[in-house]
Amino acid sequence: MGGFNLQELMSQAKRQYEVMQKKMQETIVEASSGGGTVSVRMDGRKQVLSMKIDPEAVKSGDVEMLQDLVTAAMNAASQKIDEAMQSTMGGMLSGLSGML
C-alpha cells in the first residue's frame, strides 16, 4: 500500500520551488499608462529593466501628471508579475497535491 513519504514530498517541493524561481527570473512583463505615454518593462523580481516616456509628456511641463503616469505604469507591471507568480505557484501546488 502506498504511503505518505514526507522526504519525497519535501524533495519535490524544493525542486518545484527552484523551477518557479527560475521561471520568475526569466519572466519579463511590460505595462503602460496614458495610452502608451509611459511604458515600463519589469522582471519577475520586480526590478525595472527599462522605462520609456513620450517626450511630449515632458514638454507639457505637467510634472504631477507625469508622476502619476509613471506610478500607474509601474503598479500595472507589478500587478502582472503578481499574476504570473500566482499562476506559476498554482501549477507548482497542483503538482505537489498528487503526492498527498
Where are the regions a protein language model picked out?
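N-terminal intrinsically disordered, cationic/polar leader segments
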Residues: 28, 32-52
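Long amphipathic alpha-helical segments used for membrane anchoring, targeting, substrate engagement
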Residues: 1-30, 79-100
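A short interface-forming secondary-structure element
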Residues: 51-63
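Short acidic-hydrophobic sequence patches enriched in Asp/Glu that either
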Residues: 5, 62, 69
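Short beta-strands and strand-coil junctions in structured, solvent-facing domains, enriched
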Residues: 37-39, 58-60, 78
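Residue-level signature of catalytic and energy-coupling elements of molecular machines
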Residues: 13, 46, 70
